[in-house]
A protein has these predicted regions:
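N-terminal Rossmann NAD(P)H-binding glycine-rich loop of SDR-like oxidoreductase domains
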Residues: 11-14
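N-terminal Rossmann-fold NAD(P) dinucleotide-binding loop
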Residues: 18-19
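Histidine-anchored nucleotide/phosphate-binding helix
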Residues: 22-32
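Conserved N-terminal Rossmann-fold NAD(P) cofactor-binding segment
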Residues: 30, 34-82, 332-335
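A structured beta-alpha segment of the ubiquitous adenosine-cofactor-binding alpha/beta core
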Residues: 55-84, 90-99, 105-122
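Rossmann-like NAD(P)(H) cofactor-binding subdomain of soluble oxidoreductases
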Residues: 99-168
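C-terminal substrate-binding/catalytic lobe of Rossmann-fold NAD(P)-dependent dehydrogenases
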Residues: 147-151, 162-340
Length: 340
């Protein structure tokens, strides 16, 4: 077991996703069986009791890897020495709220958190934003931590979209989820995202597009299923879960966040996965936007890197461009608020 514990900060620590995260992190699911962790739970004052109750439960679990748990409503205390920051807490959109109002509310959350990360976090901190709108919230946090914390240390969660896409393909093709590689989520974590299977392959080397055509009776049928069923269902899966379950995704979101950090820290293995990272102009995406790309990580401390070289046909380029247009509009709205 490593001698120095890794400090992991979870914002929204008293909320349902934070609750689902903390026990798996303490059990070693995120950083492995040999890395002790110190958990810091950040909450707003009215959420403190829930977070304190979760901390009591963590103590009762007696996890060997869990060194200690701190609960606080002070960002400077929460992010002090943080090596990994998982920004879960966000202002949800309510009925009648305009996008500009939502962005302004979240700027008031993620801006100060970015400043606190800059002030007191570990010099090699890595940050993943889970709270929506995740891509632009990550942009806000990164801008607020600049220039001392490089923007490349910030990412936003699209692993949930990635996993949803893999799950839908696995169900259609009657294969295990682990038998599918190189699915890509492009763009924003929103209804404009583009789940791309044109480069995906099965464990036996068969392209997923061929497997779909074989199962559905031809390439035209496969294309129709992708356009009319698969892409809309992945993009709107969150709304479907709310309708069926009566509340938003919790366990699947927490699982995706854990996998995002695990692969970034320990290595992503075979093929590519998806994460929203700061663009450096890859695939024509404007520099500085936080956009979902195909990524890999060697687990060597350098985080995710965008994998270039995937061909995009006209259809894919149009879908990516539409999602990028939305990201640009969100960035411009935040700039108009004077945040960036």
């Amino acid at each position: 077991m490593a001698s120095e514990p890794t400090t992991v900060t979870i914002t929204g620590g008293g909320g349902p996703i934070g609750y689902a995260l903390m026990f798996r992190i303490a059990a070693g699911d995120m950083l492995g069986p040999d890395r002790p962790v110190r958990l810091r739970l950040l909450e707003i004052p009215q959420g403190m009791r829930a977070a304190e109750g979760a901390a009591l439960e963590l103590q009762d679990c007696a996890f060997p890897l869990l060194v200690d748990v701190d609960v606080t409503d002070d960002p400077l205390t929460a992010f002090n020495g943080a090596r990994i920051a998982m920004l879960v807490g966000a202002r949800p959109r309510t009925a009648g709220m305009e996008r500009g109002d939502l962005l302004a509310a979240n700027a008031g959350i993620f801006g100060p958190q970015g400043k606190a990360i800059d002030a007191v976090a570990d010099e090699d901190v890595r940050v993943v934003v889970v709270g929506n709108p995740a891509n632009t919230n990550a942009l806000i946090a990164a801008a607020s931590a600049a220039p001392d914390v490089p923007a490349d240390r910030f990412s936003a969660l699209t692993r949930l979209d990635h996993n949803r896409a893999v799950g839908q393909l696995a169900e259609m093709l009657q294969v295990g989820a682990g038998d599918i590689a190189d699915v890509i989520i492009w763009g924003n974590h929103s209804a404009t995202q583009f789940p791309d299977v044109s480069h995906a392959i099965l464990a036996d080397g068969m392209p997923v597009l061929e497997a779909l055509a074989e199962r559905l009776g031809g390439q035209d049928q496969a294309t129709a299923w992708l356009d009319d069923v698969f892409i809309p269902r992945v993009a709107k899966r969150g709304a479907e879960i709310i309708e069926v379950r009566g509340s938003s995704s919790v366990a699947s979101a927490a699982n995706a966040a854990i996998e995002h950090v695990r692969d970034e820290q320990l290595g992503s293995g075979r093929g590519v996965t998806s994460a929203a990272v700061v663009s450096h102009g890859e695939y024509g995406v404007p520099e500085g936007l936080v956009c979902s790309f195909p990524v890999t990580s060697r687990g060597d401390g350098h985080g995710y890197r965008v994998v270039e070289g995937f061909d995009l046909d006209d259809r894919a380029r149009r879908r990516l461009a539409a999602s990028v247009e939305e990201l640009v509009a969100e960035r411009d709205a935040v700039q108009a608020l004077g945040v960036l």
